[in-house]
Structures are given as structure tokens and as C-alpha cells.
Amino acid sequence: MNMNTAPKQYGFYMPAEWYPHERCWMAWPCHHETWSKIGLDKAKMAYARVAKAIAQFEPVTLLVNPGDEDSAENLCKGHNIEIISLPINDSWTRDTGATFLINNERQLAGVDWIHNAWGGNYADCSLDNLIASHLIKYTEAQYFHAPLVMEGGSFHVDGEGTILTSKECLLNSNRNPHLSQQEIEQYLINYLGAERIIWLNMGLIGDETDGHVDEIATFIAPGKVLCLITKDKEDPNYHRLQENFEILKSSKDARGRTFEVYTVEQPPATYLNGERLTLSYINFYMANQGIVMPAFGYESFDRLAYQLFVQIFPGYQITQIDALDVFSGGGGIHCITQQQPKSHKLVE
């Protein structure tokens, strides 16, 4: 059944990423322009590393362009990974897949946002704009269409009423120029089932998504956030990351808690074909009892980030994998994944 009204009215909300998952959704690399820096073959191997790491903890369902199934099966077969043929433009299910919701009866719903290729970065996103509806139909979830240009990487939730996002992305004129900040807030609250929004200002320099929050800060537990920083005052990210840190330190969540703020340092500036990559340890995937986080080849930075994750995620197995090739495409581990929470079937 389709509903033209917002999910919150029916008791649906987006749970936190630490809520138990049914599966993780990914899509197989296929867009030559996206992967021009390293080539599609290396991109596929990088995605396979991520998929197999996540599949240690939960099932992975991989969307693959028709005709490209062999490469996916060769690299991923037999690792708790299901392959589904579906025409796609690109491979960022965080942004193009459905945003899954649950209610107190643990019934499943999905939000289908409007996708415009991150403000028109790519000419054709017509197939990717259909992915969310395919996922919602496949999972037999309740369907909600949101009349808002939005990507899943542009917000985080704590599942207890709080949304974390950035002004650089959501208030960008290439997304929803006809809407005010207050109107966008109301859409987010109604479609994510929340009460309060915390606005950070700027994302990372050179982020082609216009400052997605999943590169700079995230919830790690109720009342706790992890924030990206740099100690290098000459780095152009220094002031914007420091400002975000100060905002989080002075903010309260929907339940009135002042945040306990943890920080992780960004790795050194890294360039590929003259362009700085937006590397961030914040861009990880939280699976069932496991964390899949990136390594970038900087031993001391990678080690310190790993040790921090061991500390802040007690009870989770931390898996750190080489993710530089994933980030060469403009995003990270969180960007190429989308969790589906555990749920019960809707009662007809």
C-alpha cells in the first residue's frame, strides 16, 4: 500500500545503525567516470573486500548490472553474499538506496527520496532514482515517497529522536532551492521520525557531495558522537572541522543529553591525479557485532584510529581494511552500504 502521508504519523522512525540488521545492501561498480582514477577492475576488487568483510557479520545483498554478474560472482561468491541483477547507473547505495524505517511493532517501511546525482554531478541518474523503490518492493516494506532531494549520506540518526546533518549539503542551492531551512527540517523530522536536528556547517574540502555528514561526524551510541578533526592548522579542513567539534560539544540531543564527543584525526592529505581525496575514518560501516573501518596506508594514523574504535565500540569485532581505492571514487565504506534493520512482516 502506498501512503502519501509522512512515516512519523504512522509511528515509523529510522533506527540507529547499531540496531540489529537483516542485511546490508550494496551495488557493484559500473560507472566508468566515477572510477576513472583507478579503473573498474580495481574498484570491483575494493568493493568485494568491503562486502566480504561485512558478510562476516551479516548477509550482504549486491545489486549488479545485467551482464556483469560473472565478475561479482567470481569475486564474492560463497561469502554470505546474494547477487541480484538490476539496472543501475552507479554504486552508492547509501545515497540511492531506500532509507529503512521501523515502528514499535518492528514492521518495516522505506523512504524513497529524490536523487539528482549529488546536485547534478552526473548527466544520468535515472536508473539510480529507481533503486529505492526496487528495494522497498523487494523487502515488502511500507512505501513512502519523500518529495525532497536527499542522499542517505547527508544525515545520521541516533534512533532516539536526533538527526545530525550539515548546512553545506542540505541548504545547497543544487538540492532543494525552493525550500527554507525550516521546511527542510520539517521534512526530515516527518520522514525520519525524529524530534531534533543538529546542524553542522561544512564538510570536507573537495567533497563532491557538498559536505555529507558521514565524512565528518556520526553517532556511536546514545548520547555519544565521533567527530573528525585535524591537528594541522595549515590544513584547509582545520577550521571547519574545529567548528563542527565546537557545535557538537555545545549541543544536546532530543532527550536533553549533552554529547560525549570523541575525536579521530583525519589522515594526511592524499592526492590522486592532482585531486585531494576526502579520506575519513568516520566513514565506516556498523554491522551486527562488527565494525568495518578503513585503512589508508598511514601506519600510525591507521593504528590510532583502530585503537580508538576498539575503545569506543566495546563488544564489537573491529575489522580494518584497505579502503583507499573505494575513496578514490569520491566516497567511503559508509557511502557504498545501506543497512536494512531487522523487522517483522507488515500485517495485511
UniProtKB/Swiss-Prot annotation:
Matches recorded under InterPro entries: Agmatine_deiminase (IPR017754), Peptidyl-Arg-deiminase_porph (IPR007466)
Top enzyme class: hydrolase
One annotated GO biological process: putrescine biosynthetic process
Pfam families per record: PAD_porph
Keywords: Hydrolase
Gene3D superfamilies assigned: L-arginine/glycine Amidinotransferase, Chain A
Source superkingdom: Bacteria
Enzyme Commission (EC) number: 3.5.3.12
Catalytic activity: agmatine + H2O = N-carbamoylputrescine + NH4(+)
Active site: C335
Single Gene Ontology MF annotation: protein-arginine deiminase activity
Similarity remark: Belongs to the agmatine deiminase family.
HAMAP family: Agmatine_deimin
The protein's name: Putative agmatine deiminase
Source taxonomy: Bacteria, Pseudomonadati, Pseudomonadota, Gammaproteobacteria, Legionellales
